[in-house]
């Protein structure tokens, strides 16, 4: 069986259907004896350029191992599903299981925004600081 990396973009009006699509596509892979090594739902993101007057899309990344028959069925499903506006399928040499750069950057931002233990500067503290500097002069 071969390894593939798949990214597909779903029309933003169909974002509610993404979990069902993912379930359908993973069942196609696993029923044929394949494996899903990595599955990341990147959510709704802004497109670099409009596609059919659409400016946002829901992105999904999958790293899979499957047979050619399962891959043919997946490409057929992608082609005839109107909710999928673009898809990209790349053949890989081995399974990729670590976080993608998109997901890693997202988790770094979550960690950074979650660190509320350091004091924040507010407008009141800045006013007090400028007032104390004026008094010193």
Curated annotation (Swiss-Prot):
One of its GO terms (molecular function) is small ribosomal subunit rRNA binding. This is Small ribosomal subunit protein bS6. The keyword RNA-binding applies. Residues 99-137 are annotated as: Disordered. Residues 105-129 have a biased composition (Basic and acidic residues). SUPFAM superfamilies: Ribosomal protein S6. The keyword Ribosomal protein applies. Pfam families: Ribosomal_S6. Belongs to the bacterial ribosomal protein bS6 family. Gene3D superfamilies: 3.30.70.60. It comes from Marinobacter nauticus (strain ATCC 700491 / DSM 11845 / VT8) (Marinobacter aquaeolei). One of its GO terms (biological process) is translation. It comes from the Bacteria.
């Amino acid at each position: 069986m071969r390894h593939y990396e798949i990214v597909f973009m779903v029309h933003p009006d169909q974002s509610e259907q993404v979990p069902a699509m993912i379930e359908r596509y993973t069942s196609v892979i696993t029923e044929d004896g394949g494996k899903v090594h990595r599955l990341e739902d990147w959510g709704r993101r802004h497109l670099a350029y409009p596609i059919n007057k659409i400016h946002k899309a829901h992105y999904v990344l999958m790293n899979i191992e499957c047979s050619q028959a399962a891959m043919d069925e997946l490409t057929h499903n992608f082609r005839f599903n109107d909710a999928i506006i673009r898809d990209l399928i790349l053949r890989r040499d081995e399974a990729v299981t670590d976080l993608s750069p998109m997901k890693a950057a997202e988790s770094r931002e979550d960690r950074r925004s979650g660190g509320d233990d350091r004091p924040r500067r507010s407008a009141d503290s800045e006013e007090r600081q400028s007032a104390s500097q004026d008094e010193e002069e």
